[in-house]
Amino acid sequence: MKPLTILAGFAAALVLALPASAADKAKEQAEIQKAARESLDKFYKKKPAIEGEVKAAPGYAIFRTYGLSFVVGGSGGGGLARDPQARKDTYMKMAQASAGLQAGAGEKDLLVIFKSKAAYDNFVQKGWEFGGAGSVSAGVAGKTAGGGSGQQEISDATTYTLTRNGLDVGGALQGTKFWKDKDLN
């Protein structure tokens, strides 16, 4: 009788935990949606032409990342990829590793605007990995300065990075990976 009691208790705990898990999932999705709206507004304010690019694109992705570096660095974050025609969001994660002459900590927003539906679909279905880009940037409180305009061209996509409250200085080789968030989709 004791194993049956233990099994019943485990089943009851599992059933009670499921609604909380669904509520947590919905809460996290809502937080990502809010962060995405805030980030887009900041990109639009910084460079108004981006709004037209986003509206004309077959898809885009927006991420908020947090990182720390001193010679070796890393950052990670989450966000979403949006298909505006299907009105569908796919929740995604991002991780970045770097090595080189660098020091800093901060929060950044990353916007990827896809030039083709195929590039967007490939990003969502297979993720993305790329690396080898040098970076030199400095920014405080949402302002970017340094090596370039904060815009970078990748095959069939344009990316924009907005430094929110951090300072990154150096020439670092970075590898970045994007993938679907299996818990939020």
Question: Which residues are covered by each model-predicted region?
Answer:
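Bacterial N-terminal signal peptides that target proteins for export
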Residues: 1-10
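Hydrophobic core
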Residues: 10-16
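Sec/Tat signal peptide C-region and signal peptidase I cleavage site
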Residues: 16-23
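Small-residue-enriched, tightly packed secondary-structure blocks
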Residues: 23-185
